[in-house]
């Protein structure tokens, strides 16, 4: 059975940390493919503060060009209204039929997992893969993982990756302050930021 990773996010902008996480998940879990799923209108973020979805899609598409095992899906962008993870996973499960999905997300999501809508469906349609993030204690995360494993009769995969302290927020702030960011970004992404004059002072 084909194994497909699903890596969602606003990607505003996508950076080398995202590429590293997706690549490590691909290698460690022996996935056939990792699908990047740029968020449309995420329910947990202020929509007015997010770059236009078409531009974010363009940045992700450019960033993953060098990797044959990465792809991009526009389901959440094309779907009008709120985007919930369980709906995305259900869509992918029905679209691909005979596949095993691995939903890749950060440690912050594991801590707040009980607040996610229809969490049982997320576990029904996918294997949850959680990677560590700066500021989160590994032992606390593993304890939380065990609690959810028992509560939902599942087996969350924990990826102990390098803590790369790069964030989209940091990049936006640096661009806003006219500081260099190209070493944080995959090739071509900085050109798109320049093309649309993103994140700069108004």
Swiss-Prot record:
It catalyses: nicotinate beta-D-ribonucleotide + ATP + H(+) = deamido-NAD(+) + diphosphate. Keywords: ATP-binding, NAD, Nucleotide-binding, Nucleotidyltransferase, Pyridine nucleotide biosynthesis, Transferase. GO terms for molecular function: ATP binding; nicotinate-nucleotide adenylyltransferase activity. SUPFAM superfamilies: Nucleotidylyl transferase. Catalyzes the reversible adenylation of nicotinate mononucleotide (NaMN) to nicotinic acid adenine dinucleotide (NaAD). One of its GO terms (biological process) is NAD biosynthetic process. This is Probable nicotinate-nucleotide adenylyltransferase. Pathway: Cofactor biosynthesis; NAD(+) biosynthesis; deamido-NAD(+) from nicotinate D-ribonucleotide: step 1/1. Its EC number is 2.7.7.18. PANTHER family: NICOTINATE-NUCLEOTIDE ADENYLYLTRANSFERASE-RELATED, PHOSPHOPANTETHEINE ADENYLYLTRANSFERASE. Belongs to the NadD family. It comes from Clostridium perfringens (strain ATCC 13124 / DSM 756 / JCM 1290 / NCIMB 6125 / NCTC 8237 / Type A).
